[in-house]
Amino acid sequence: AKIRRLVVASAHAWRDAIPPEMLAQQAQVNAAATEFMKETPMYQLYQRVAPRPEDFPRLLDKMGEAMAKDFDFSDEIRGLQMPTLIVAADADMAPPSHYVEMFKLLDGGLRDGGWMGEGRPKGGHALAILPGLTHYNLFLSPLFAAVSLNFLDDQES
């Protein structure tokens, strides 16, 4: 199946966009953090939807391994062919400027959009920085749902 439109939410494109204090916290994510993590909304959701909630410690080990690796998805972002909406919170894990830099990789924010939208990025890409939200509660926001659905339903690009 072809992906017609893409929403990328609260995801950073390169590891050095993450503040050092967050990298230090991420280094502590492993099975040993299970009891602490049981107090988080992430665990509550996992417990409700996972076929095997008892595997939560394994998930934490896998997450810790993944977060320890360096990454830079700049080339992959530049290569996106479908209209892509980058959504972030104004108090996300990476600063808003990071998501602007991601948008620039899609030809966004480089010029005035123009009266008729002629200066918008080719390909129908868009950026939304949502106010009053964080990396952890963005997906719970009605504003996130509305912005994402509006973009996904757009037939003009």
Regions from the language model: what does each represent?
Residues D112-S157:
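Catalytic active-site module of serine/aspartate enzymes centered on a nucleophile-bearing elbow/loop
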Residues L80, I86-A88:
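Short beta-strand/loop motif that positions the catalytic acidic residue
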Residues I77-Q81, L106-G108, G119-K122:
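Short, conserved loop/helix-junction motifs that constitute active-site signature segments
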Residues K2-L45:
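Flexible "cap/lid" loop of the alpha/beta hydrolase fold
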Residues M63, D90-M93, G132-T134:
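Acidic beta-to-alpha connecting loop that harbors the catalytic carboxylate
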Residues I18-M22, H98-Y99, L140-F144:
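Residues at alpha-helix caps and immediate loop-helix transition turns in enzyme cores, especially N-
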Residues M93-E101, L110-G113:
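Conserved alpha/beta-hydrolase "acid-adjacent" motif
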Residues L60-E76, M82:
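Active-site nucleophile elbow and catalytic-triad environment of alpha/beta-hydrolase enzymes
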